[in-house]
């Protein structure tokens, strides 16, 4: 009952924040009605409610795909150039405008988190309560403010720094990137000093995992931040890689206390049957109570639109990245090994994503069970058969009293999208369409409910191991442990014969034990890309890695050329494929970052381009 009361108070507070989603929205705020720290923070219950409200804001940064669209710039993800996917396709092509819904939502929703965090930072000290409870509130606020600025600075570059609830601050000039990072580091250091390593009460801990952020998660984040500062655009180099290694190593060295693991089977990493697992070091919890607040709406995002089960097709796998991807359990868990077609809850056919049939394939049509619906269905099918009677191209037929539809047409692509398909967020269903909590199997029927309670993996323990290994190599530290951690990550991910052999970017295959520091650093960088491929909710996505290594230009130039990729061979026949989203024009550094949202530029002249 106490938890429900606190959640209710938190929801009331969250409601007060909904109106002011973005930096610019504050400019329309009436000061007389403003929720201030002095008005809200009175009791310890207010502290918990404020953190609940903060997490309500955090959930919305990832509930649906829009705020994550900037991650489509990475070389792992691409988009449908048509349908209703123009927003993510524009970002995939490094050609977004300020009115793009992905740009607007990324900006608005992360600044909404910042506002909620600022309210806590500026007000929690007013509570007459225990310092421990106040520290928890401060720590969560400092952490998620840092996290939000970390997201924004990598997506937009220079951004306004807003640290309090004073509306006079909200026409601020965008701060330099270095200044934003200085604030991020300070907030994370504060969070590390304020946060516990474990919670023992609800709602901070649920399902045997810490829902609220912990000290070790803040340390891991600081390691990632230092790595970003070491690379592009600040290029602080060796010193900051050493700082990153220190933070990551401290988490690793204390893991006997924390209990993080690498799931033995890679299929369990994203499994709904393993939703609250011990590999996730930082997650965002969700439930499925309704739309647009704290559910996960990603379960239909990976399935292609053409497959018959209501897939949204928001993210397609980039072809060249998929082709380079090491074979093994990890690839089979991230990509569909076969593409299935579905009618209701029945799989009607399957194929490789590149297959082109040599003859037509007809499949049975699933008939309705309700008498009235069946009568209507039969009437519609008969009318279609009659309409196509004199046409060379028929799509429906009746054979021995059974209705069939043309699924694959001779000489035409079986899968219209003609791309690899991710399975990270996809879930299986039972015969009635209900969601199954088990590792995803690409050959079984797919859940089409669209909303579920998936816990989003922002940081996994495998990433911390790789961050340490790469940073140690780039900082000139001892390589023995770094090599061990790289092998540890690969042991469950790739085929056993390939664990010790890594293909580097120049195509050379190097045994891990024989690697020098530069080769090991590159191997770990590449490996992290395989680990987070297609997982656009990761704190450090493939796009973020490419930004740090200043390789987005390389990705852009490859996409402009768009040379055909040989994806499979069958005897003398070669199958080739090209990317569908067109990327054109010359490269310039400003293509790296998204433009400021148009609406915010109208309110704050300092955000005009």
Predicted regions and their residues:
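Acidic, glycine-rich segments characteristic of secretory precursors and extracytoplasmic regions
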Residues: 2, 23-73, 104, 109, ...
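Bacterial Sec-type N-terminal signal peptides, specifically the leucine/valine-rich hydrophobic h-region
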Residues: 17-20
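Short, surface-exposed recognition loops and adjoining beta-strand edges that mediate ligand/DNA contacts
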Residues: 38, 64-82, 165, 196-216, ...
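Conserved, well-structured interaction surfaces
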Residues: 44-64, 82-156, 170-182, 188-203, ...
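Elongated scaffold/linker segments in the mid-to-C-terminal portions of large proteins
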Residues: 51, 62, 85-105, 250, ...
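Structural register within alpha-helical repeat arrays
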Residues: 138, 145, 222, 229, ...
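Short coil/turn linking the two alpha-helices of tandem helical-hairpin repeats
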Residues: 153-155, 160, 199, 228-235, ...
């Amino acid at each position: 009952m106490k938890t429900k009361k606190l959640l209710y108070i938190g929801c009331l507070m969250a409601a007060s924040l909904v109106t002011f989603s973005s930096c610019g929205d504050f400019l329309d705020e009436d000061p007389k009605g403003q929720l201030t720290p002095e008005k809200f923070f009175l009791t310890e219950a207010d502290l918990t409610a404020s953190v609940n409200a903060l997490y309500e804001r955090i959930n919305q940064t990832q509930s649906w795909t829009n705020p994550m669209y900037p991650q489509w710039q990475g070389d792992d993800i691409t988009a449908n150039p048509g349908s209703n996917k123009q927003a993510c396709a524009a970002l995939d092509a490094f050609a977004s405008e300020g009115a793009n819904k992905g740009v607007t939502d990324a900006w608005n929703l992360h600044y909404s988190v910042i506002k909620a965090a600022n309210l806590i930072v500026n007000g929690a000290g007013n509570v007459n309560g225990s310092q421990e409870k106040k520290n928890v509130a401060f720590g969560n606020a400092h952490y998620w403010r840092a996290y939000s600025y970390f997201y924004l600075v990598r997506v937009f570059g220079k951004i306004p720094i807003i640290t309090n609830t004073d509306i006079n601050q909200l026409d601020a000039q965008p701060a330099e990137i270095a200044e934003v990072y200085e604030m991020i580091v300070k907030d994370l250091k504060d969070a590390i000093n304020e946060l516990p390593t474990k919670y023992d009460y609800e709602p901070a801990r649920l399902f045997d995992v810490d829902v609220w952020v912990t000290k070790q998660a803040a340390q891991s984040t600081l390691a990632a931040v230092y790595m970003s500062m070491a690379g592009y655009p600040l290029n602080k180099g060796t010193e900051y890689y050493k700082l990153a290694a220190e933070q990551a190593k401290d988490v690793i060295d204390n893991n006997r206390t924390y209990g993080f693991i690498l799931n033995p089977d890679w299929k369990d990493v994203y499994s709904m049957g393993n939703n609250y697992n011990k590999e996730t070091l930082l997650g965002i919890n969700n439930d499925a109570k309704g739309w647009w607040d704290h559910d996960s709406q990603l379960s239909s995002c990976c399935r292609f639109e053409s497959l018959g089960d209501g897939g949204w097709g928001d993210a397609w796998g980039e072809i060249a990245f998929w082709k380079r991807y090491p074979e093994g359990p990890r690839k089979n868990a991230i990509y569909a090994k076969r593409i299935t077609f579905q009618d209701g809850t029945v799989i009607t056919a399957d194929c490789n994503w590149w297959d082109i049939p040599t003859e037509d394939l007809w499949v049975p049509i699933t008939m309705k069970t309700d008498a009235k619906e069946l009568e209507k269905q039969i009437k519609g099918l008969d009318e279609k058969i009659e309409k196509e009677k004199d046409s060379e191209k028929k799509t429906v037929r009746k054979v021995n009293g059974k209705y069939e539809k043309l699924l694959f047409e001779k000489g035409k692509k079986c899968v219209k999208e003609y791309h690899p398909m991710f399975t990270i967020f996809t879930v299986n269903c039972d015969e009635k369409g209900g969601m199954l909590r088990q590792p995803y199997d690409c050959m079984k029927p797919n859940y089409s409910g669209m909303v579920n309670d998936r816990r989003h993996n922002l940081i996994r323990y495998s990433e911390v191991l790789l961050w340490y290994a790469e940073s140690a190599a780039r900082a000139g530290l001892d390589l023995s442990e770094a090599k061990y951690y790289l092998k540890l990550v690969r042991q469950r991910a790739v085929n056993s014969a390939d664990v010790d052999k890594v293909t580097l970017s120049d195509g050379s295959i190097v045994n891990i034990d024989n690697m020098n520091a530069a080769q090991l650093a590159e191997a770990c960088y590449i490996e992290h890309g395989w680990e987070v491929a297609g997982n656009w909710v990761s704190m450090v996505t493939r796009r973020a890695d490419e930004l740090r290594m200043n390789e987005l230009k390389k990705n852009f130039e490859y996409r402009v050329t768009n040379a055909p990729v040989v994806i499979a061979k069958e005897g003398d026949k070669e199958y080739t494929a090209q990317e569908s989203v067109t990327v054109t024009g010359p490269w310039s550094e400003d293509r790296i970052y998204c433009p400021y949202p148009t609406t915010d530029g109208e309110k704050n002249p300092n955000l005009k381009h």
